């Protein structure tokens, strides 16, 4: 079993593999040309159906990583959420400030899906 802090090199043909169109659009608008190492690791684990725990520095892209990781589970084949959709995910943050930061990040990431985020 590899060490918990090991990083596997992953190569994808697309900048953000298996990312639904609304997210690709949001990422492009934010000038995300390629995933960070944390995002690559999360997307690879998601593609393999693995569970994971992620710990990385501030600014490493963790919020976008888990926002993308749950996207296909939440949306399925659709590109937008129904207007009357009830809550579908809960993300717990240890502080109010971090909860608000997560909300801001997911708000732009999910903008084109019709999703709402609250903190």
What kind of region is each of these model predictions?
Residues 40-52, 63-83, 100, 105-110:
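Walker A/P-loop NTP-binding motif
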Residues 53-55, 90:
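Short hydrophobic/aromatic beta-strand immediately N-terminal to the Walker A/P-loop
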């Amino acid at each position: 079993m590899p060490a918990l802090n090991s990083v596997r090199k992953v190569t994808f043909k697309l900048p953000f593999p298996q990312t639904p169109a609304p997210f690709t659009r949001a990422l492009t608008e934010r000038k995300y040309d390629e995933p960070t190492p944390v995002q690559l690791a999360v997307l690879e684990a998601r593609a393999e159906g693995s569970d994971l725990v992620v710990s990385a520095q501030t600014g490493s892209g963790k919020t976008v990583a888990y926002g993308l990781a749950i996207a296909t589970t939440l949306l399925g084949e659709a590109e937008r959420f129904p207007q009357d959709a009830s809550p579908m995910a809960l993300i717990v943050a240890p502080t109010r400030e971090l909860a608000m930061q997560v909300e801001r990040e997911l708000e732009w990431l999910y903008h084109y899906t019709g999703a709402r985020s609250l903190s």
